Amino acid sequence: MNVTATARSLLLTEFVSAFFLAMRYFFKPKPTINYPFEKNPISPRFRGEHALRRYPNGEERCIACKLCEAVCPAQAITIEAGPRRNDGTRRTVRYDIDMVKCIYCGFCQEACPVDAIVEGPNFEFATETREELYYDKARLLANGDRWEREIAKAISLDAPYR
């Protein structure tokens, strides 16, 4: 054994350098969060639970153009349009999304000309049965009402990049 290796083993240089490395990381802020109680901020482009939005006067935005249904690669969206109204517009009678099929690609949101269907900020929507993951129009509108403030803020932050 040579003198250098003997000196290193007696002086425990690897141990001391490892100790200082551990102490350096010990006093830095932790990257881990306490998840149920703390949540990381999400991006304005985050794609979570779907929602149907309303206009400020309370009327639903969806004009039953069926672009979202046509563009959906997973064929998770089903729409039935109602008859035309006196003013020439129409609304949906049925708007269903099968969340089991949905791949959260965001194509429906991009295709919508009136920003009616959006993917909101909610990512905690676990269910106990598959039937609960079949969203009808009432549930989608309720999601839109619940998350409207966050959705509007995210859309306004993302507007320069659209």
UniProtKB/Swiss-Prot annotation:
Its EC number is 7.1.1.-. Disulfide bonds: none annotated. GO terms for biological process: aerobic respiration. [4Fe-4S] cluster 1 binds at C62, C65, C68, C112. One of its GO terms (molecular function) is iron ion binding. SUPFAM superfamilies: 4Fe-4S ferredoxins. It is found in: Cell inner membrane. Its cofactor is [4Fe-4S] cluster. NDH-1 shuttles electrons from NADH, via FMN and iron-sulfur (Fe-S) centers, to quinones in the respiratory chain. The immediate electron acceptor for the enzyme in this species is believed to be ubiquinone. Couples the redox reaction to proton translocation (for every two electrons transferred, four hydrogen ions are translocated across the cytoplasmic membrane), and thus conserves the redox energy in a proton gradient. This is NADH-quinone oxidoreductase subunit I 1. It comes from Rhodopseudomonas palustris (strain ATCC BAA-98 / CGA009).
